[in-house]
From Swiss-Prot:
Pfam (any one): Radical_SAM
Organism: Bos taurus (Bovine)
Binding site for [4Fe-4S] cluster 1: 106, 111, 117, 352
Family: Belongs to the radical SAM superfamily. Lipoyl synthase family.
Major site of localization recorded for this protein: mitochondrion
Gene of this entry: LIAS
Key words of the record: 4Fe-4S, Iron, Iron-sulfur, Metal-binding, Mitochondrion, S-adenosyl-L-methionine, Transferase, Transit peptide
UniProt-listed SMART domains: Elp3 (SM00729)
Protein name (Swiss-Prot/TrEMBL): Lipoyl synthase, mitochondrial
Entry keyword annotation includes Membrane: no
Catalytic activity: [[Fe-S] cluster scaffold protein carrying a second [4Fe-4S](2+) cluster] + N(6)-octanoyl-L-lysyl-[protein] + 2 oxidized [2Fe-2S]-[ferredoxin] + 2 S-adenosyl-L-methionine + 4 H(+) = [[Fe-S] cluster scaffold protein] + N(6)-[(R)-dihydrolipoyl]-L-lysyl-[protein] + 4 Fe(3+) + 2 hydrogen sulfide + 2 5'-deoxyadenosine + 2 L-methionine + 2 reduced [2Fe-2S]-[ferredoxin]
């Protein structure tokens, strides 16, 4: 699985789910007008990456350990504690989801960027990430808390149509379609992905569609089916450096197979934008991160996101290290030097983020113009 409140103030600490952190905050209506306006309009990508929503003055004073010692459980550093800006469209989108029985990674994972992505804005791209093919995965990666089963429930045949209907109602500019792994199906769910993209493009040819797919067990025909479905961005996450694949991911997944997925998508659709993501803080070293980034760029991957791994439950892999915002900024610089068209690197950066989609929207438009 490759995945992405309100009311009174609560005193509990942040919740974590997969690679996301959620800190309950005050309802926007209780805030001063100036602060309310700032939260509703939302910061841009660089502001969020650098953590301007948190009190940066406390960062240098932080004395907690950033690397885990044996038997220790690391405390959350201040740069991972941040408010969640809620846009005006939040409740509308949430109600639409309920009525159509759709799941989003944004909600399931309690992503801290949900208010910004769903809210859109004058200079933003209203974005949502829909999780297809149910909520039960056939794999058991050690970083992910999505429930697993050997034989999940059958697919909802109406899901592709309902997804297209939801996007039409929302008026989104950019949608990310992702899914659980479905090794129980002959094509891994590739046809389901392709149908959903087709319905979306029929209803709104201008909508930009990103598919964040499983590895389809390395089935090239399945990869082709999705790549040729009319999508604009093909994403598949390698998750971590090659040396930690067996420790972090299900045994059926591996770095070389994931790299082949990304390569093959570009081979059958040279104009498609390819994208992947790496979690940091699992015990990797700098040399391994650099070598991984280099291998991805050599495979012609266009866009890369790097974010902090967050332990979802005590049963999952512990965080080995909290990476500082400065180190994330360093990796962003390295990504740019290696030639990625877009590198988003920061503690709270995830595979899908509104300012990232805004950039990708412009990149897609440029490539389409060049192809004409």
């Amino acid at each position: 699985m490759s995945l992405r409140c309100g009311g009174a103030v609560r005193t509990v600490g942040p919740r974590v789910f997969g690679r996301y952190v959620f800190s309950p905050v005050r309802e926007v209506s209780f805030l001063p007008d100036e602060k309310k306006e700032f939260l509703q309009s939302g910061p841009d990508l660089q502001e969020f990456i650098s953590g301007n929503l948190a009190d940066k003055s406390t960062w240098d004073e932080y004395k907690g350990n950033l690397k885990r010692q044996k038997g220790e459980r690391l405390r959350l550093p201040p740069w991972l504690k941040t408010e969640i800006p809620m846009g005006k469209n939040y409740n509308k989108l949430k109600n639409t989801l309920r009525n159509l029985n759709l799941h989003t990674v944004c909600e399931e994972a309690r992503c801290p960027n949900i208010g910004e992505c769903w809210g859109g804005g004058e200079y933003a791209t209203a974005t949502a990430t829909i999780m297809l093919m149910g909520d039960t995965c056939t794999r058991g990666c050690r970083f992910c808390s999505v429930k697993t089963a050997r034989n999940p429930p059958p697919l909802d045949a109406n899901e592709p149509y309902n997804t297209a209907k939801a996007i039409a109602e929302w008026g989104l500019d950019y949608v990310v379609l992702t899914s659980v792994d479905r090794d129980d199906m002959p094509d891994g769910g590739a046809e389901h992905f392709a149908k959903t993209v087709s319905y979306l493009k029929e209803r709104n040819p201008k909508i930009l569609v990103e598919c964040l797919t499983p590895d389809f067990r390395g089935d090239l025909k399945a990869i082709e089916k999705v790549a040729l479905s009319g999508l604009d961005v093909y994403a598949h996450n390698v998750e971590t450096v090659p040396e930690l694949q067996r420790k972090v991911r299900d045994p059926r997944a591996n770095f070389d197979q994931s790299l082949r997925v990304l390569k093959h998508a570009k081979e059958v659709r040279p104009d498609v934008i390819s994208k992947t993501s790496i979690m940091l803080g699992l015990g990797e070293n700098d040399e391994q991160v650099y070598a991984t980034m280099k291998a991805l760029r050599e495979a012609d991957v266009d866009c890369l996101t790097l974010g902090q791994y967050m332990q979802p439950t005590k049963r999952h892999l512990k965080v080995e290290e909290y990476i500082t915002p400065e180190k994330f900024k360093y990796w962003e610089k390295v990504g740019n030097e290696l030639g990625f068209h877009y590198t988003a690197s920061g503690p709270l950066v995830r595979s899908s983020y509104k300012a990232g989609e805004f950039f990708l929207k412009n990149l897609v438009a440029k490539r389409k113009t060049k192809a004409l």
